[in-house]
Structure formats: structure tokens, C-alpha cells
Amino acid sequence: MWIPWQDLSPVTLENLIESFVLREGTDYGEHERTLEQKVADVKRQLQCGEAVLVCSELHETVNIMPRSQFRE
């Protein structure tokens, strides 16, 4: 189930994004990026529709994924 990011409180959204970023590993590419930079990148992707929040009732989880991979 897709969850509009706008429906979440700012604190909840920030916590979800931070949790997602911290789970994604440590591939920094050429330059290491701060947690704040990574959170800002994900937030921008949610705001422009490149990424979506997805809730799995089966697994009782919320995840962030590229919109192109999301199937209802």
C-alpha cells in the first residue's frame, strides 16, 4: 500500500528517511556524504515523485522505494 509522504508528521517522515538511509549500507562513491545530505536527497526524491513510501501489512513495515519499482 502506498502512503503519501505528506500525510506523515515532519518528525515521523524524518525518522523513516533516516532509518532507510542507515539501512542502505556504506557505498559512498567518490565522496563520502553526511547523513543529513543523504536524508535531504531521499526527501527530494519523495517530494518530486521519484520515490514512494510503501507499507507492507503482511510484514508490518514501511519502506522507501523507487516509484518505478512500486506495483499496487
Curated annotation (Swiss-Prot):
Q: What Gene3D superfamilies does UniProt report for this protein, alphabetically?
A: YehU-like (1.10.10.610)
Lineage, top-rank taxon, reads Bacteria
Q: Which family does it belong to?
A: Belongs to the UPF0270 family.
HAMAP family named in the record? UPF0270 (MF_00690)
Protein name per UniProt: UPF0270 protein YheU
Q: Which organism is it from?
A: Shigella flexneri serotype 5b (strain 8401)
User: Highest lineage ranks of the organism?
Assistant: Bacteria, Pseudomonadati, Pseudomonadota, Gammaproteobacteria, Enterobacterales
